[in-house]
Amino acid sequence: MYIKDSYLSNQLCFLLYVTSKEVIKKYTYYLKKHDLTYTSFMVIMAIENEEKINIKSLGRRVFLDSGTLTPLLKKLEKKGYVQRMREKEDERNLQITLTESGINIKPTLKAISDQVFEDFDISQDEKDNLVNSLKHVISNNFDYTTH
C-alpha cells in the first residue's frame, strides 16, 4: 500500500504508530496459535534461561510497569511458562523465572519473530538499520528506570 505524501505521512510519530500496529498485528496472528499475546511474547523473550529476575527489573527491560506485568505474569504462570517465587529474606521481592515450558517455547517464538519480518518487504540491511536507529532514539531519549 502506498502512503500518500502529506503532512501526516511525514510525521515520525504517525509512521512509528502505523508500523508498530501492523507489526503487532502480524505477531498476534502467529502467536494466537500458542494462546499468547504480543506482550506475553515480549516478557518470555526478555527473561534469560535460568535467570531469576524481579518484577521491577523485568519491567525496565520491557518498558512495562508492575501494574501491567503482575496480571500478565499470573496468566503466564497459569499457562506454565513462568514461575513466580517470593524471596525468603524479603517477601515483598517477587522473583520470576522461566519454567521448562517457558524455555522450550523460546525457539518457536524466535521463529515467529523471524517469520514476521519475512512477511514484510524489507531487506536484512533495512531491518538492521531501522533497529539500530530505533535503539539509538530509545537509549538517548527515554529513561525507564524511574517506572
Curated annotation (Swiss-Prot):
Cellular component GO terms held in the UniProt record: cytoplasm
PANTHER family: TRANSCRIPTIONAL REGULATOR, MARR, TRANSCRIPTIONAL REPRESSOR OF EMRAB OPERON
Compartments, record wording: Cytoplasm
Molecular function as annotated in GO: DNA binding; DNA-binding transcription factor activity
SMART domains listed in its UniProt record: HTH_MARR
InterPro entries on file: HTH_MarR-typ (IPR000835), Transc_reg_Sar_Rot_HTH (IPR055166), WH-like_DNA-bd_sf (IPR036388), WH_DNA-bd_sf (IPR036390)
Annotation: DNA-binding region: 55-78
Name of the protein this chain belongs to: HTH-type transcriptional regulator SarZ
The UniProt record lists the keyword Electron transport: no
Family membership noted in the UniProt record: Belongs to the SarZ family.
Keyword Cytoplasm: yes
Main location: cytoplasm
Residue intervals of the HTH marR-type domain: 9-139
This protein's UniProt keywords: Cytoplasm, DNA-binding, Transcription, Transcription regulation
